[in-house]
């Protein structure tokens, strides 16, 4: 706006922007900072002053962007294109808002977000920015498909082929080729050892992923099949394994969480095994018909699954797909129900969202910049 705003002491401030938490702003707003929800932000007017604050570490930052956008008309279109409206003189708008995101973890998986941290923060996503100045990020150790990350076949398979899935009489391992033999107790011991080592440098509230590789070659050995036959389905076997890891993690630090996938052959709820309280279920929509809303009859089976997971998941995360992975350039007819799908997730108790769009080299697709915005 061409106006330089001096930084002044709070006690002597008048006609000021109060940014961040303080005893004074807490009193003026009538809030207890400790009771604020994750990433909650407040944009409030007090006489001729503005209070821009919220939950640490990102609430105040979000409040500043909120006022710039909705009070002054600034638009952050992409990392390289910003629209700053001109005004003949500086003014205070009348805009106020208090808001806490329904999803505590928010990631739009596009290169525009992944490679440009400052823009990611302006879009209120919180899984990519790593510096304190940008509010940090929600850390998920390992990301996804971590069986082969924590026990890579390239390292362990030659000495311990029995740790890996048996398929048609042959042991197979690797991210694209196989899974783990989840009933193998020696494998479980080593896996837990590795997970605890990975958690070592991380503090309270850390999340670590323990999830199947990106294939459907689950183990067909006698022990694994007997467990499935006795308890219900492949999800039971996965959760029995994940629960044992989660129990070890809880002994290490009771504030930490273990995330796993409800994906492909584990998308359905288990028959008997229930997830521990420190287990996060990330339900994936991969089999859905994305040209139709998730609450349509075309996606009835997913509606059944998410309703069932809502009943038993201590924490429910979502991995959603919002592009055509076969042809990124082809128009994807999901514009009108993107918001409806997100609302469906909220209605079923989901508290984190990962929207996988077109990404990778070039990251060019169906109006990608607009989709990110």
Locate each region found by the language model:
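Substrate-binding cleft of secreted/luminal carbohydrate-active enzymes
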Residues: 333-373
């Amino acid at each position: 706006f061409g106006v330089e705003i001096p930084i002044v002491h709070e006690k002597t401030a008048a006609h000021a922007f109060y940014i961040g938490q303080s005893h004074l702003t807490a009193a003026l707003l009538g809030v207890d900072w400790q009771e604020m929800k994750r990433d909650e932000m407040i944009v409030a007017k007090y006489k001729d002053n503005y209070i821009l604050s919220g939950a640490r570490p990102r609430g105040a930052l979000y409040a500043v962007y909120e006022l710039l956008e909705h009070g002054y008309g600034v638009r952050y279109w992409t990392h390289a294109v910003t629209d700053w409206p001109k005004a003949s003189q500086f003014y205070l708008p009348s805009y106020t808002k208090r808001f806490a995101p329904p999803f505590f973890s928010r990631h739009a998986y596009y290169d525009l977000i992944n490679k440009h941290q400052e823009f990611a923060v302006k879009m209120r996503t919180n899984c990519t920015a790593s510096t304190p100045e940008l509010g940090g990020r929600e850390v998920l150790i390992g990301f996804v498909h971590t069986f082969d990350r924590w026990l890579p076949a390239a390292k362990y398979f030659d000495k311990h082929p029995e740790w890996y899935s048996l398929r048609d009489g042959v042991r197979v391992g690797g991210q694209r080729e196989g899974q783990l033999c989840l009933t193998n107790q020696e494998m479980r011991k080593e896996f837990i050892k590795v997970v605890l080592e990975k958690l070592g440098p991380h503090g309270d509230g850390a999340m670590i992923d323990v999830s199947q590789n990106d294939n459907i070659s689950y183990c067909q050995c006698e022990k694994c099949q007997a467990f499935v036959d006795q308890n219900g389905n492949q999800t039971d076997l996965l959760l029995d394994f994940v629960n044992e890891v989660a129990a070890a993690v809880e002994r290490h630090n009771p504030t930490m969480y273990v995330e796993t996938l409800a994906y492909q052959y584990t998308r359905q709820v288990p028959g008997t095994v229930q997830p521990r309280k420190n287990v996060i279920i990330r339900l994936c929509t991969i089999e859905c018909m994305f040209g139709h809303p998730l609450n349509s009859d075309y996606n009835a089976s997913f509606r059944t699954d998410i309703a069932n997971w809502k009943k038993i998941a201590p924490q429910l995360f979502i991995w959603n797909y919002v592009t055509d992975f076969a042809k990124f350039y082809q128009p994807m007819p999901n514009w009108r129900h993107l918001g409806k799908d997100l609302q469906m997730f909220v209605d079923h108790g989901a508290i984190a969202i990962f929207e996988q769009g077109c990404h990778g080299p070039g990251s060019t697709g169906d109006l990608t910049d607009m989709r990110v915005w």
